[in-house]
Amino acid sequence: MDRIKCTVAYDGMHFCGYQIQPQHRTVQQEIEKALQKLHKGELVRVQASGRTDSTVHAKGQVIHFDTPLSLEEWQWSNALNTMLPDDIVITQVEKKTEEFHARYGVERKEYRYRVLVSKTADVFRRNYVYQYPYPLEVNSIRKAIPYFIGTHDFTSFCSAKTDKKDKVRTIYEIELIEQDDELIFRFVGNGFLYNMVRIIVGTLLNVGQGKLDPDSIPEILAKQNRQFAGKMAPGHGLYLWQVNYNN
């Protein structure tokens, strides 16, 4: 058996998230459907670095699967991309040992969130950025960002629906990139809780709008209560950008 690692990019707009759900179109469902065709009807389960929600995009999602087929890496890439819909692309394939695991071997993840700061919607970017129609004080946002960096209990910044009991995570970097009419938030951490990036972005936008003081972030973290953080930003501005492994 070969263990195959794939890096996957997808446009999340027309998916109900990554993970299989009955009666809904998902990324995992489409990948496993393509693999089933390649394996003459045999079901092949894939493991991913993590789930993404409905409408969330990925540039660098990572999956693995085990297979009895002996194909070269480029053959896997060509075969899968031929069978996958045009909103999913396999961008890289590597053969790995059994020690590699797409989920449990993750060392760090990078997410990016795009905000279009404009009163006027952009019809061509509407599925890929969060249009924010209010003026923002970028310096206030920059002042708030360092409070999130480091190891914290992020209970205040995750969905109440999370199934994770341990809410402690480490954020290594948060970078705010000003690019034309967009603000791009770049997050690197050892892992992220359910909706965590989107809630942090929503909170930082509140800071930029003057609804929250930048220095209030430590207090919100300490309260460990979701109701004190900002509104969650929508899914379509979020991208799983890159996943790094310890092996």
From Swiss-Prot:
Keywords, ordered alphabetically: Isomerase, tRNA processing
Residues at the catalytic site: D53 (nucleophile)
Root EC class: isomerase
Sequence positions that bind substrate: Y111
Catalytic activity: uridine(38/39/40) in tRNA = pseudouridine(38/39/40) in tRNA
Enzyme Commission number(s) of this protein: 5.4.99.12
Residues passing through the membrane, by range: none
GO MF assignments: RNA binding; tRNA pseudouridine(38-40) synthase activity
One Gene Ontology term from the biological process aspect of the record: tRNA pseudouridine synthesis
InterPro entries tied to this protein: PsdUridine_synth_cat_dom_sf (IPR020103), PsdUridine_synth_TruA (IPR001406), PsdUridine_synth_TruA_a/b_dom (IPR020097), PsdUridine_synth_TruA_C (IPR020095), TruA/RsuA/RluB/E/F_N (IPR020094)
Family to which this protein belongs: Belongs to the tRNA pseudouridine synthase TruA family.
Protein's job: Formation of pseudouridine at positions 38, 39 and 40 in the anticodon stem and loop of transfer RNAs.
Subunit structure: Homodimer.
Full protein name: tRNA pseudouridine synthase A 1
